[in-house]
Swiss-Prot record:
Role description: Involved in the methylaspartate cycle. Catalyzes the reversible cleavage of beta-methylmalyl-CoA to propionyl-CoA and glyoxylate, as well as the reversible cleavage of (S)-malyl-CoA to acetyl-CoA and glyoxylate. In addition, it has a small malyl-CoA thioesterase activity. It can also catalyze the cleavage of (S)-citramalyl-CoA to acetyl-CoA and pyruvate.
Keywords linked to the UniProt accession: Lyase, Magnesium, Manganese, Metal-binding
Molecular function GO labels: L-erythro-3-methylmalyl-CoA lyase activity; magnesium ion binding; malyl-CoA lyase activity; metal ion binding
Top-level class of the enzyme under EC nomenclature: lyase
Cofactor note as given: Divalent cations such as magnesium or manganese.
Any Pfam family: HpcH_HpaI
Positions with a binding annotation for substrate: 176-177, 253-254
Name this protein carries in UniProt: L-malyl-CoA/beta-methylmalyl-CoA lyase
Length: 346
């Protein structure tokens, strides 16, 4: 998987402030490791009901000013719910307005609270209609969905299979609404982890070659002895777990979270050195006509080679989108090797 989405940062598209687009513009102008791979201007839960129209207006006003300089993808989260016709109508209107006004600057839309496969098809149809009405080429706008309902979970495999022949490019876990819909409880201060769901999400999205994104971590700050401090450790633990099971990216609610997730979902210097060494040694052995190849005591075949190649492909994807991040993270020699090495498999 080389589609880049280490970070899925939601930013309220309108807030009750003299500068209601403050967080939207902040996301669009973020630099360095605080620049997300996917910026999600939020018209849904992150924006008060009375400010939804202003949120759409803010996106229309500010996206053209910043889209060319923003390296990542921009996908607004619109209103939608499989069991709420009014929410779907509002979402249709939002998609239609945005596609008409700034469709050329957007990469797609995020639909929350989708139900079974037919509901996902309906959401995709909304984008197709808006795309056509706006005069955009077919397939210009992608779609990501938030998996946060029981019907959506029941059709997870079918939804991912649908992605192989549609504009669906990513699935995002929404644990808060999912827990509420299932009647889950928070006991002893601990929320359900939903390990089985996350592992299924990783598997099914990998099979469909689309991205999987973990859920939000909203315990941003702790307070102790009158001092409030950022909960860096808690978020890092969640992101590291997601990375371990093959979740491609993590939901970010704050620039500090974006910086952490970008780094955690980035191959370490040690990983890069190790995997490049094995790729280079394998390539050299093959040039010399060697059959079986052993590198540092490990038998390397096509399958293990592809694992090493994934590291390089990830770094190349980051380097293409955010060169300032790779240049700050890796030394010049290591980065040059990653850019230049031939990948025989993968």
């Amino acid at each position: 998987m080389t589609r880049l989405c280490r970070t899925f940062q939601t930013a309220p598209a309108a807030i009750p402030n003299d500068n209601s687009a403050k967080f939207l513009v902040s996301g669009l102008t973020s630099k360095g490791f605080q620049a997300p791979d996917w910026l999600v201007p939020d018209i849904e839960d992150g924006t008060a009901p009375s400010m939804k129209d202003e949120a759409v207006d803010n996106i229309i006003e500010h996206i053209p000013d910043h889209a060319d300089d923003f390296a990542g993808d921009i996908l607004p989260r619109v209103e939608w719910a499989y069991d709420d016709a009014n929410a779907r109508e509002r979402g249709i209107e939002q998609v239609t307005r945005l596609a008409e006004a700034v469709g050329e600057e957007l990469d797609g839309f995020v639909f929350p609270k989708v139900g079974r496969l037919d509901d996902v098809r309906d959401a995709a149809g909304v984008i197709a209609d808006a795309e056509r009405d706006a005069g955009l080429p077919e397939g210009t706008l992608e779609m990501a969905i938030i998996l946060e309902t029981a019907p959506g979970r029941s059709d997870l495999r079918e939804i991912c299979q649908y992605a192989t022949d549609s504009r669906l490019s990513g699935l995002v876990f929404g644990p808060v609404d999912y827990t509420a819909e299932l009647g889950g409880r928070t006991l002893d201060g601990e929320r359900p982890r939903w390990d089985g769901l996350l592992e299924a999400l990783s598997n099914e999205t990998s099979a469909a070659d689309i991205v999987a994104i973990g859920g939000p971590f909203d315990q941003l700050f702790h307070e102790r002895a009158g001092v409030t401090y950022y909960n860096a450790e808690g978020y890092a633990d969640q992101v590291a777990y997601e990375a371990t099971i093959g979740i491609d990216g993590s939901w970010s609610l704050h620039p500090k979270q974006t910086e952490q997730a970008n780094r955690i979902h980035m191959p370490t210097v040690e990983e890069m050195e190790r995997d490049l060494h094995k790729i280079e040694s394998f390539n050299e052995a093959k040039r010399e006509g060697t059959g079986a190849v052993v590198v540092d005591g490990q038998m390397v075949d096509e399958a293990t080679y592809k694992n090493f190649a994934n590291t390089v492909k990830t770094v190349r994807a980051i380097d293409e989108t955010h060169p300032a991040q790779t240049e700050a993270y890796y030394d010049d020699d290591l980065l040059a090797r990653a850019r230049d090495v031939e990948l025989i498999f993968g």
